[in-house]
Structures are given as structure tokens and as C-alpha cells.
Amino acid sequence: MEQFSNADNQQASLCELSWLGGIVDGEGCITVSKRVGNRTASPIVTIVNTERKLLDKVQQLFQKYGIAYYVRVHKQLNQAECKRPLKQKVEFVIAGHKRVPRFLDLICPYLISKQPQAQLLLHFCAVRKDRVHQAFLQIDKEICSKLWVLNGRGTKW
């Protein structure tokens, strides 16, 4: 059996992480999720897709790199209303002030279109690190508003 060098492993890791960064750029969302009914928010990164092979690869890489996540499977629309069969939509969710920075630190060098959102969310996590369960300060709200504008979601609390 052929032995792989450490350089080969590093090259494979670089390739995997750059691929994952591209998936987040194209299929992901990097934001702060507001909780309805109260004034708290959580950093969140999601990847949504319907392609089983792609989803399996994302899941494999999350497990390989120790990324904590959960999965949401979205209900399909009524098939009778659609002209063609719909694929099952699956969403991988990474949430939290510790999990999100750990993931973004891995993929940030490979992001292109979502690089500004990633940098803002990393800043948000750093600013909120020691006061996760405390009231939001003006700086927290400003960071969230900038993120929401970048994502085309508005700025209201």
C-alpha cells in the first residue's frame, strides 16, 4: 500500500476546505439569526441543497474536521401543485458563538462572495464572547444590521 506524505495530506485538506468554502459561497448563508419574541440573536452558518452526493460530502467533511452541526429536512410542497417531482431540501446548520468561529476559521481563506459576512460574523462572535447571555449593546446591533444589509434582509430589530 502506498504511503502518503504529510504534504499530500495537507494538499488534500486544502482542496477539501477550499471546496467547502465554495459551497458556502454558493449555497450557504452567513448571518445572525434573530429569535422571534425576544431580543437575542445567534450566529449561524447554513448550507441548503437537494443533491444527495453534495450533502454527503459536506457531512463527511464536517465530521472529518469536527464541526458540530444539525440537520433540518424541509417538507416538500404538494406534488400535485408542481409540474415535476421535487427533491428533498436539506439544510445543514452550524450555530453558536463557539461553533461558528471554529468553522469560519477553517473556510474563511477560501470564501470570495461571502468573505465580508464571514469577517463581520467573526467580529460579532469575538465582541459577544464574554457576554453571550447579556443584553445587546449598540455595537452588537450595528454588526447585525451590517450583516443583514449584506444579505439583503433589512436592518430592523
Which stretches of residues belong to each language-model region?
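Internal intein/HINT superfamily modules and their associated LAGLIDADG
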Residues: 1-157
